[in-house]
Amino acid sequence: MTDQLESFSLEVDAWIEEHCPESMRTPMPVSEQVWASSDINFPTTDSKTWFDAMVSKGWCTPEWPVEYGGGGLSFEESKILRSRLKFFGCRPAQINFGISMLGPVILEFGTDDQKKEFLPKISRGEIWWCQGFSEPGAGSDLANISTSAQLKGREYFINGSKIWTSEANKADWMYCLVRTAKTEKKQAGISFILINLRQPNIDIKPIKLLSGQSPFCQVFFDDVLAKESHRIAAENDGWKVAKRLLEFERTMMADLGSEGAVDVEPIKTYKNSKAIDAPGQLKLHKKIIKHEMRNHLIDLTMARTGIESKVGFSPAALILKYISTEETQTRWELNVTSLGAGGLEIVEKSQGPKQEIAKSFFYSKAYTIAGGSSEVQLNIISKHILGLPS
């Protein structure tokens, strides 16, 4: 590390000590997440203090240009910042799909006006974004979408339906794939459009799951309007934008568990637990050590992928999504095993580390489906990276 970067690291440490409340340096339960929104909700005073400090510094989007609400940091400085935030156990100041997925494609493909209109609001957490990709007839075969957008004057009239849209009933805007032309090659007639969800003719229906929760929705469009100026890239050229966004999504999915919801390292659960008998301890301990080593290798690969993605497509993003989500499931399985017979106990309205481990264990089963199932990822890897025949 250069003297300049060493000095920056010390500055970051001092800033965190001054601006990050102690309560924001503890594992974060789902109930205390701060979601970006036009009507943002802060569960505690400290969460608002931490949010305001990070936004003011531009460190929610550390590598974005300052004029767009970012911190203007170099890649190396940003890496140090993330490392020090993780070292102190700092909670993410906000949960924001705009930062992790949409913002990077606007930076890459958007016009100057689009960057000025959306990026500062994304960085400040003023918009809750949802993703309108999947449809009842287009899941893994995403290019099969049929939701149409017809340009009349300076506005698109959108008709159709999106499904499995996370938190659409809470979102302000949707970034959406629509069909703007019927072509022989399905990918050639797709456009990428930003849609304001706070308008008439949109019907959003939450989908109730077995758990009783409804994080997913189906969204119906009936002559819904979107400005032509809110189309990212040229008409019928949205597939390249979608592919790039999916790279960022897969990188985000690969990083699941390292920030956001409560993250509990299996080695800590193991050390604090008396539930495993002596014969089983050695075998479990070996599994945990192997898991920790794999996670370290994943972190190193993610750092390399971050550099590669600056200049274009990085095949490691596809591989990381598969490996990391599988490893995330392993993490929670090891946590549950360390707790013994009571590891999966869930008591209604009860809180605490044990509860969070059980909930995270169950939810982790979705990681290998969300953002593209593991089976689909393996197909893509075999065809497009390894060059194997279909």
Annotate each predicted stretch with a short phrase.
Residues D3, I202-I298, Y367:
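Glycine-rich beta->alpha junctions and the first turn(s) of the following alpha-helix
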Residues R154-E155, N159-K205:
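A short core secondary-structure module
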Residues I80-L81, M101, W239-F248, M253-E259, ...:
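Glycine-rich phosphate/cofactor-binding loops in nucleotide/flavin-utilizing enzymes
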Residues T147-Q150:
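A structural signal for short hydrophobic beta-strand segments in well-ordered beta-sheet cores
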Residues Q94-D113, G139:
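N-terminal glycine-rich flavin-associated loop
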Residues G125-F133, L177:
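A short, Trp-centered hydrophobic/proline-enriched beta-strand micro-motif
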Residues M28-S31, A275-P279, N295-S350:
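C-terminal helix-coil-helix/basic helical segment that borders enzyme active sites and/or dimer interfaces
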Residues M1-N96, E117-R124, A254, E265-K274, ...:
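Amphipathic, small/basic residue-rich leader segments at the start of a protein or domain
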